């Protein structure tokens, strides 16, 4: 199926050679996206990445200034999918029990009762996650990984699906607690959200002059679970798996890929969770685009989102104002993509 990637080869076309996969659940997902866009103007990449994480079963970290529809996006998504939504504003005085819950003594009943916290929902917005101390961040990230919480001697499972969308403000750094590398690694993707285009902003302002737009429930959570199962059956050519691993390896050992200029910029490269997240999210993106197989364009489209928060840059990179995206641009250009026969093999 694949040719060795040691020699640069011509890029294969990104147009699939077979008819798009069309099933009822995926068509409903498209309908759900249209319904969400009735409320959210622009921010197409953020909306698509939210759906990618939903289908892939991962969590999303968003970096952007306030006012870019992050809260409205996940709240609207919850309404369209019929799930429960909670928002937690992270502050320095927050404690873990404010998130996960606690046991409360009831004198009238002569015993303790468990009061579950706001993490027990389908869609959780952790707003400005870097404003809470490390123990609170750890409590949330443990729930993200385990999908359960232990309070006292009892274990409580969060409802499925469970999506955490955490935000960070890139402007304000005073009074913040940066996420440790081992914890930020738990997020499947990290995206950078910028200001909308002028025509999109005009639409936003025009909509604000009228009544709030209501949305319908389009895709039940049961159908979302079917989509998640379908995402796991999307075919990934072994050559693309090797390509994802090579991209990660190039962030760790850039000299081996002819990236000597990058060696002084990266202290630690992407962990093995990087290519795992990249391949998993590429599967979800292929499903959203109507294919039952991954193409190289899916991988390339998600490399930065899957890797940027997993790189630890050197002081030299910071002094030169070089970003993780600068490093990844060089990596993408240096690592040759494999030539593939597009489509799912008959035996796959």
Segments from the language model and where they lie:
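C-terminal engagement/docking regions of AAA+ P-loop ATPases
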Residues: 2-15, 19-22, 256-348
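Conserved C-terminal "switch" segment of AAA+ ATPases
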Residues: 18-26, 39-40, 176, 190-261, ...
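Pre-Walker A (pre-P-loop) alpha-helix and adjacent loop at the N terminus of AAA/AAA+ ATPase modules
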Residues: 22-68
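Conserved alpha-helical scaffold flanking the Walker A/P-loop in AAA+ ATPase domains
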Residues: 49-52, 105-125, 154
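Walker A/P-loop
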Residues: 54-91
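Walker B catalytic acidic pair
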Residues: 64, 127-128, 139
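P-loop (Walker A) phosphate-binding loop of NTP-binding proteins
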Residues: 65, 99, 167
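Canonical AAA+ ATPase core
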Residues: 106-111, 128, 132-136, 144-234, ...
